[in-house]
Structures are given as structure tokens and as C-alpha cells.
């Protein structure tokens, strides 16, 4: 392959550029991480690390399967701008991930860039502690897994050894730890319950220590008293002393009232029918009178014509 070039998703294979052969890669961040003064072009080969390349990382895979290069940007949000050794592998070579990555502020596993303000961490997260959370990303035989290495959260419950009553000596304490933060929460103070006095409704209660029986509180309310007084007034109004008898008598009175109303309705219906009949008779009489009037008018006209005929003859 003298001058053959292959383009793939991992970069471009170029065997005729400057005597180097291997995979070239150009890692480009999203548009909101690129600087305005950097180039927006695909530059092959490692960068010198001195210019503002606008958020690119330029590197290449050598023949031995590792990526060597230099960060093109020294600002935050990318690799630290120092000489960086990336432990990665060329295409279709999963065995290259078996070598453990180097440690230090400039050693990264994989091609993930740091998003934090300090690029001295490992993997995709920087050493900047966002709420006490760190993550380490490593390759495992061509795969990718996630490991939480610096996050610790525990919640323990300890029984405090005390002598005497535990309610008066503090009882149980709860401890929680999150990284270096250690907080001890004291137990709640004991609650004392009084068993003598008033129940809140003005009714005196008995003393449990002396064996007195507490007085049962009254459950009557003002609305209940008003309703009962109203019923008693109604019964007195009708002269009724027994509740059941009062209900029966009230029902009888209501029935009598209903019967009276029904009878009155029947009588009114009969009177209405009589009035309708009388109106109909009156209308018929008026029709007869009108017919008689028409007949009399015709008779008068006929008589007048006869008189005119006699006078002309």
C-alpha cells in the first residue's frame, strides 16, 4: 500500500504521509466547547500543543497499538495541555486493552476528555469534587465499565451502653457518614405523658397512680343540643309527650292535609269543566244568532228588490 488511504469511523489510515503509518484520529468536542479563535478543520497528526486549536485533541495510533499525542488546548474542559499518553488500541485489536494504564495527573484511560475545571483526574470525570462523587472509567477486554471508587455512604445505628433508664440517658444515636463528613444526630428527648388533670374539654380526669377512674367526657355539642330543643318545642306545640306518638300524629295530620288538598283539587277540576261547558254553550248560541242575522239580512234584501220591481212596472 504505497499511497492507499482508508477512511473509517475511527480515523484514517495513511501509509504515505511523512513516513508514518497507522491510524490517525481527530477528537472533536461539541460546538459549545470549541473556542472562537481555533480552527474548525480536521488536522491529521499530533499537534504541538502551543496554539489554541479550538477544543480538538490530535493524536495517532502507532504501530504498537497505543495512542501518542499532545493536547491541542490548554484551557479547561479538555485535556490538560501537557504531554498525554492515552492507553487505547487500534481498530479490531481488543488485546491491546490488557495493559494497565499509567497513573498520575496526565494519564487517562480511553479517549474521554475531562469536563471539569481541573483535568488531573482519571477517566471522563475530573478531580473536581462535585458533591463527593468520583468515577473511574477503564477498558476491560474491549468493553467499557463504570466503577465508583471514592463514594461512600453508610447509615449505622448504635445502641449506647448506659446504666439505668434509656429514656432519660439519651437512648439510641444515629450516625451517618459521607466521605469525610461525619454527623452525629442526638436522640429526641423523652416525652412525659401526664395522666392526671383535664382532657382539654374541661372534664377532670382521674389520677392513674391513685387508682381513680377517669370521668367519661361529654360528647354533646351545641348543634346537637339545639336540634333536640327544637324537636321538644315542636312536640310541646302539638301537645305531644311521647316521641313515637308524636310522629304518628304528625303523619296523620300530614295525611289529612294531603287528603284535603286532593279533595279541593277535585272540586276545582269539576268547576273548571262546568265553566268550559258553559263557555261552549255560549259560543254555540252566538253562532246561531249570527246565522239568524245573516238570514234576516238576506230576507231584507229580497224584499227590497221585490219593491223595486213593482215600482218600475
From Swiss-Prot:
Residues 1-56, 83-102, 144-233 are annotated as: Disordered. Keywords: Activator, Chromatin regulator, Coiled coil, Nucleus, Transcription, Transcription regulation. It is found in: Nucleus. One of its GO terms (cellular component) is nucleus. Residues 1-17, 217-233 have a biased composition (Basic and acidic residues). The keyword Ligase does not apply. Residues 38-50, 144-155 have a biased composition (Low complexity). One of its GO terms (biological process) is chromatin organization. Residues 84-96, 161-178, 193-212 have a biased composition (Polar residues). Involved in transcriptional activation. Also required for ubiquitination of histone H2B to form H2BK123ub1. H2BK123ub1 gives a specific tag for epigenetic transcriptional activation, telomeric silencing, and is also a prerequisite for H3K4me and H3K79me formation. Its precise role in H2BK123ub1 formation however is unclear. This is Transcriptional regulatory protein LGE1.
Amino acid at each position: 500500500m504505497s499511497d492507499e488511504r482508508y477512511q473509517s469511523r475511527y480515523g484514517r489510515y495513511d501509509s504515505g504521509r511523512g513516513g508514518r503509518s497507522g491510524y490517525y484520529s481527530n477528537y472533536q468536542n461539541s460546538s459549545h466547547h470549541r473556542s472562537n479563535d481555533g480552527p474548525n478543520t480536521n488536522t491529521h497528526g499530533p499537534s504541538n500543543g502551543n496554539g489554541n486549536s479550538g477544543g480538538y485533541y490530535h493524536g495517532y495510533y502507532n504501530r504498537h497499538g497505543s495512542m501518542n499525542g499532545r493536547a491541542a488546548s490548554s484551557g479547561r474542559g479538555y485535556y490538560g495541555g501537557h504531554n498525554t499518553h492515552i492507553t487505547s488500541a487500534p481498530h479490531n485489536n481488543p488485546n491491546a486493552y490488557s495493559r494497565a494504564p499509567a497513573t498520575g495527573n496526565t494519564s487517562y484511560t480511553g479517549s474521554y476528555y475531562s469536563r471539569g475545571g481541573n483535568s488531573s483526574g482519571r477517566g471522563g470525570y475530573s478531580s473536581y469534587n462535585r458533591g463527593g462523587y468520583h468515577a473511574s472509567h477503564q477498558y476491560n477486554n474491549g468493553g467499557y465499565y463504570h466503577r465508583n471508587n471514592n463514594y461512600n455512604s453508610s447509615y449505622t445505628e448504635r445502641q449506647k451502653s448506659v446504666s439505668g433508664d434509656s429514656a432519660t440517658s439519651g437512648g439510641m444515636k444515629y450516625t451517618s457518614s459521607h466521605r469525610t463528613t461525619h454527623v452525629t444526630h442526638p436522640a429526641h428527648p423523652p416525652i412525659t405523658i401526664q395522666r392526671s388533670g383535664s382532657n382539654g374539654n374541661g372534664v377532670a380526669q382521674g389520677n392513674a397512680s391513685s387508682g381513680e377512674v377517669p370521668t367519661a367526657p361529654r360528647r354533646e355539642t351545641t348543634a346537637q343540643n339545639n336540634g333536640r330543643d327544637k324537636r321538644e318545642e315542636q312536640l310541646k306545640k302539638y301537645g305531644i309527650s311521647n316521641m313515637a306518638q308524636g310522629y304518628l300524629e304528625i303523619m296523620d295530620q300530614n295525611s289529612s292535609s294531603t287528603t284535603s288538598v286532593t279533595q279541593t283539587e277535585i272540586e276545582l277540576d269539576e268547576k273548571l269543566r262546568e265553566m268550559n261547558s258553559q263557555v261552549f254553550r255560549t259560543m254555540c248560541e252566538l253562532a246561531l244568532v249570527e246565522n239568524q242575522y245573516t238570514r234576516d239580512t238576506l230576507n231584507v234584501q229580497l224584499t227590497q228588490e221585490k219593491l223595486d220591481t213593482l215600482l218600475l212596472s
